[in-house]
A protein has these predicted regions:
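N-terminal beta1-alpha1 ligand-phosphate binding loop
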Residues: 2-28
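S-adenosyl-L-methionine/SAH cofactor-binding core of RNA-modifying enzymes
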Residues: 30-115
Length: 183
């Protein structure tokens, strides 16, 4: 039974890059019975209907950093615990146990592209937002001029898997990431 669904909403330019770590996520988790990963190419003018439907039913969350000016429901996930960042905006924390949100979107793009994707996708702005607080800085070395404190897509997924108890899946991804990052 699928316990977690990850949608890698990927910018078209990212699909062509040899340094894209979203493909590693798909490769590492493709055999998992608990986790499903789908790559969806982001379209500015035509949102994916499944994501729209899940968003409208409030069953879709967005893994994206906190923004100081947000008024939406936002959680910080640290050491396996959800912490409300805007308690007035929601009623229940999305835990693996209560199953309230098992569908999560990750923006697979550069930070500049991801910010643009979020701005131009109203349905994503209305999603519950999950911010991860990693214990360590990024180890990703294949791109220059990275935003301080930012993680690549594979690192975000590893952190999410760690924090939500999918340790074996996280370790499989970590092995692939370590090899990929040595190039």
């Amino acid at each position: 039974m699928t316990e977690l669904v990850l949608y890698l909403l990927t910018h078209s330019r990212e699909l062509q890059k040899s340094t894209n770590t979203g493909a590693l996520v798909v490769q590492a988790l493709s055999a998992s019975l608990k986790i499903k990963v789908e790559v969806i190419e982001w379209q500015r003018k035509a949102a994916d209907q499944r994501l729209l439907d899940l968003s409208e039913r409030q069953q879709l969350g967005l893994v994206y950093p906190l923004q100081a000016d947000t008024a939406q429901a936002c959680y910080l996930l640290q050491q396996g615990q959800y912490q409300a960042q805007n308690p007035a905006a929601f009623t229940e924390l999305p835990t693996r146990q209560n199953g309230s949100i098992k569908h999560w979107v990750l923006l697979d793009a550069t930070w500049q592209e991801a910010a643009k994707m979020l701005r131009q996708s109203p349905y994503l702005q209305s999603c519950y937002r999950l911010a991860l607080k990693p214990d360590a800085p990024s180890l990703y070395k294949l791109r220059r001029n990275q935003k301080a404190g930012a993680l690549c897509t594979a690192e975000v997924v590893m952190e999410l898997l760690q924090q939500t108890g999918f340790i074996n899946e996280k370790e499989q991804l970590m092995l692939l990431f370590d090899e990929f990052n040595k190039r």
